[in-house]
Amino acid sequence: RMIYDGDILIAQKGSLKARKRRLSFKDYQVLACDINFEAPTKTEIKIEEDFSKDLEEFGQAASLALFDYKRKSRSKGFVLSLSGGADSSCIAILVAEILRNGLSELSKEALGKKLGIDIKENDTRADLTGKILQTAYQGTKNSSNETFESAKALAESIGARFYHWNIDDEVNSYVSTL
């Protein structure tokens, strides 16, 4: 799938005159800028790229993609097997970023409507994360207490609902079947 960044640029003779926010949660953006066509300024074409923001932009793009997926699929939220490792932790944070980024641009009411969730005025961002993200730590005899504690701490810090159970019986059942 593609994620459209929604970037709007207005330039003249290689000079950037105006720019709107990329990766917006808004339905649309409008940008206006005065351009003098009678006496345009002559400038050298200069492209400056700030590569230090690549990771930040990845987070914005991925959280916007998850936001769009939730809206378009009309799902009630996300369920994540949170192992305490880097991969599942990253996904949990990206879901939480939906709310951080969404609330930076939209009112609580507008965001709640788009996400299909009931938002109360006194709900915190963590409360809202708990409404769209449920996590489960599925431990076995091979799991460490460190991964359990890591998963639990992350879920609590972002407000996700956290469940845990042992799945040794299920693992043994699969192993015996094979």
Protein language model regions, located:
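C-terminal beta-strand edge segments of enzyme domains
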Residues: 1-57
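ATP-dependent adenylation/nucleotidyltransferase module used to activate substrates
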Residues: 54-178
